[in-house]
Structure formats: C-alpha cells, structure tokens
Regions:
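N-terminal glycine-rich phosphate/pyrophosphate-binding loop and immediately adjacent elements
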Residues: 37-168
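Active-site rim elements
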Residues: 107-118, 249-257, 324-331, 388-399, ...
Length: 485
C-alpha cells in the first residue's frame, strides 16, 4: 500500500483526524539542525523577551560568546509552558488561583505542560547532557493500559491477528497485484502467521499476546479472547492502540527526573545571577531602535529576541502592521491537563506507567506515573485534553467543576478512583495569561514571521516544524541565533 492509499484508508475509517495522525506518523523527523556558530559578541547588549525554553536557549548561547544578556519575563517564574507543579505551588489562570495541595514528597509532581521527550529530539537532549539534567524513561505506550476499558494488549493482539488472517486469505485468493514465487509465498505466509499469531490453518483464534483472563501459574492459564472484527469499526480503539507508531511517540521516550522544569532550571542556572528579571512584562518593542518599553521604564539593546507566544507578540504596537496581523492569525490550541494524588491502585492491576484512553470522554487520556513504583502515593494525570471544543468546555468550568467532571469520567475505567483521589489541580492553557494557549498546531504560520524585523529577531516552538514540542523551541532559537551578524 502506498502513502496516498494509506492516507485515504485512514480518512475513510477515522475521518480527517485519523488521516492527519497517519500523516504525522509518516512525516520525516524534524531535527533541530546544527547549533549555530555565533561570532564573538563582547560589548553587545541583547534583550531576550520571555524566559521559556526558546528564550533561555538564546540567552545561554549568547552568554557563551560574551554578549551582555538580559532576559525579561512577565511571569513570576521561568519556563513558560514548561511547568512542573508540586505541593505549595500556585496556578494562576484568568479569574482563578489554585494552590497545589500534593504531599511534600519529591516523587509527587505534575508536569502540567510538556511531559515527554522523544529519543530523537537531540537538540533538547544535548542540553540535558551538557547541563547534567538526569533523565528517566517515560512509559508512553503500555500494553496493560486501557482504551474504553479494554486492555491495549487485547486490542493490539486482535488487530494484528485479524489483519494477518485477512491478508492470508487474500494470498490464497490470488489477490496480490504482482507475481510472487512459490518460495516467497511460503515466506509471506510464515511472516503473517508470526505477525498475527495465526494457527496452521491461517486463522486467528486468540493468543497470549492479548493478556490473560486467568494468568499461568501451576496451570497453563487462559488468554483473553479475540475481539470481533466489528469492534474495529470504531477508530478510537485502533488509534489508541497504535498511537505510539508515530515518530514523536515511539519508544524510547524520556523525561527529566523530578519534572520537566529541571531543564529550564538548569539553563537558568548556567546564566550569570541577575540575568533573568521576573514580573517584568513588555509593553512595546521599537524594532528600528532596539528599544523595549516596560511598565517601569525602557531598555535599549543592539539586538532583541522576542520569544513571546504569538497572541502576546501580536499586542506589541511597535511591530509592523503586517506582522501583527499575521501574529493575530496564529491560533493557539486550548489544551488542558488535570492531575490528582492517589494511592497507586493501578499498579495492583499491573499498570506501571503509560496512558489509558477514553477517546469519547472530555478527559481523553489518563497518564500513570513512570517512576516511584510501589511508593504509597502517586500523581495521576487524570485528563489530557487537546481537542479544541473539549478544551474550551474544560476551561469554562471552575477548578472544582473540572475535577468533579474528570473524576466521574475516569470512574468508568477505575471505579475506585473518586473515593481515593485527593488534591486535584488543573491547568487550562488558554486561560494562562502569559501563554494564551498550548501550541499553534493546525495554524498556518507565514514563513516571514521567523524573519527579523529591524533589530528584533523571533523564536518559539510555533515557528518550527514541531509546535508544542520543546525541540521545536530549541530549533527556532538556533534559527534566530543563526541570523545574528
């Protein structure tokens, strides 16, 4: 099957969303590219607007070549959307504030923004290596997790078995569009038997790959039965089972020990004290003069690097009319997350890390912690929402209403959860005042937005082929730095 046929089949089966998921899985890996070789910049002053990933990468690379760097951050913390929440932290959305009530334990934290790093995101991983950020494996795909209450192991085994059985029948009916020798036909049949765990007659009658109704011990055990073909008319099941085939979701996935904020903290620690100024929002930028207006005055620089999210950069009146219009057209996805602290009851069911799916529910996904196994308590990401209507619906609720709705939906997978879950905390990124959304995926970003305007350069994950990924922020930072002369 060629690429076009595969996309067409996905579109018929699951609509445009499925076709886009397949397209993402087939797309080439967008790497950060080579790190720019900057000229010596002693005596030159640079203002970096924003202390998220892109801003901190720019600041560190400029500091390394001798520039005098100041980072101006509107928020009271660094990191932007790289946000790790622990007990005592405060989340401030428009019109609501939440104090995180998790127990003060090093293993109890919630990555409310990015939570995973693909193994091929070598720009970001390079900084982890250089700066000594310890990493752990993140369990992204777990066969013991569930989709609509069905174990992913059972779904995957049934998918493979049914597809292999259908393909074997096609071979027997001579439906291949190219001649195949008898020897190759035997090899193809053997491959399909192995792929789908077929019997000698080419039939799928079940397999231990599906997991167990009764696990083996002294007795041999009873595998879960095959799922009927009609089950797979629902694309939610097979997409949940196969999402980790996408290049950005395949093992090995990684995460910093102790939370994603460890990376931005390491970048900030590598800068001279006083480089980063918090609580200092930018009101305007004058590109021709390198002037930046703040609530408390004005700053001048030889170079300004703006790493603000597009909706915030669009508010800067000194930028050109064309740029501001284009920035206003970059729509941010209103993704959201919610987490709770709970006893690790899921481990008693054999679930150690990974993601369960409720594709038709608002919460969409549940993420189980990938570390601290067998500890008394864990932080369960009870909702990860990226669909726009669901994200807007979630954001419109109060934190208490979000938690009640999420627990009710999650109880269809884990009935014990409402009785044991504590300390819910949620982040709706569209309501975070210094983000105004999670990523710009789906938006048409005009290429000229990544080009400098006067003395002002621009960076951010939304200006890369990897919006929503920290590697995209690194790539865009390197691109902006490469234009400095």
């Amino acid at each position: 099957m060629n690429r076009r046929a595969l996309l067409a089949a996905a579109s018929v089966a699951g609509g445009a969303a499925a076709a886009m998921a397949v397209l993402g899985a087939l797309a080439p890996i967008a790497a950060a590219g080579p790190r720019p070789r900057l000229p010596p910049m002693a005596g030159r002053r640079v203002l970096v607007l924003g202390a998220g990933m892109a801003g901190l990468v720019c600041a560190l690379e400029l500091h390394r070549v001798g520039a005098e760097v100041s980072v101006l951050e509107a928020d009271t913390r660094i990191g932007g959307r790289s946000l790790t929440l622990r007990g005592g932290d405060i989340v401030r959305e428009d019109g609501a504030a939440q104090t995180v009530a998790f127990d003060r334990d090093p293993g109890l934290y919630f990555n409310a923004g990015p939570a995973r790093i693909p193994h091929h995101h070598q720009g970001l991983l390079g900084y982890c290596r250089e700066l000594g950020v310890p990493l752990q494996v993140l369990v992204n795909d777990n066969r013991a997790a569930l989709a609509n209450g069905v174990p992913l192991s059972q779904i995957r085994a049934s998918m493979r078995g049914l597809v292999a059985e259908l393909a074997t029948k096609a071979l027997g009916a001579g439906l291949l569009d190219a001649p195949v020798s008898e020897a190759d036909m035997l090899r193809l049949r053997a491959m399909l038997r192995n792929f789908g765990a077929l019997d000698r007659e080419g039939r799928f009658r079940g397999s231990p790959r599906a997991g167990w109704v009764e696990p083996p011990g002294v007795a041999p055990g009873t595998p879960r039965p095959p799922l009927p073909l009609a089950v797979f008319a629902d694309p939610a099941l097979w997409m949940a089972a196969d999402f980790a085939e996408g290049v950005n979701y395949a093992a090995t996935m990684l995460a910093p020990e102790g939370g994603m904020v460890r990376i931005v903290a390491a970048l900030a620690a590598a800068l001279p004290p006083g480089t980063i100024r918090l609580g200092d929002p930018v009101l305007d930028v004058l590109p021709a003069e390198g002037r930046v207006r703040l609530a408390g005055g004005e700053e001048r620089a030889d170079i300004v690097i703006c790493t603000l999210p597009a909706p915030l950069a669009a508010r800067l009146p000194g930028l050109s009319v064309a740029r501001r219009a284009a920035l206003s057209g970059v729509t941010q996805e209103p993704a959201a997350k919610l987490a709770v602290q709970a006893p690790r009851f899921w481990e008693a069911a054999g679930i150690y890390g990974g993601i369960s799916w409720l594709p038709e529910a608002d919460i969409t996904q549940l993420w189980y912690p990938s570390g601290g196994f067998h500890a008394p308590q864990g932080v369960l990401t009870l909702a990860y929402i990226w669909d726009t209507p669901r994200g807007l619906r979630f954001a419109a609720r109060s934190p208490a209403e979000r938690a009640a709705a999420a627990l009710a939906e999650a109880a269809t997978l884990h009935p014990e959860l409402p009785a044991v879950a504590r300390h819910p905390v949620s982040v709706a990124w569209g309501r975070m005042p210094w983000a105004r959304g999670a990523w710009a995926e789906g938006s048409a970003v005009p290429p000229f937005l990544s080009e400098p305007e006067g003395r002002v350069h621009f960076a951010g994950d939304w200006l890369s082929a990897l919006p929503g990924w920290q590697e995209g922020a690194v790539a865009s930072a390197w691109h902006a730095l490469s234009a400095i002369r």
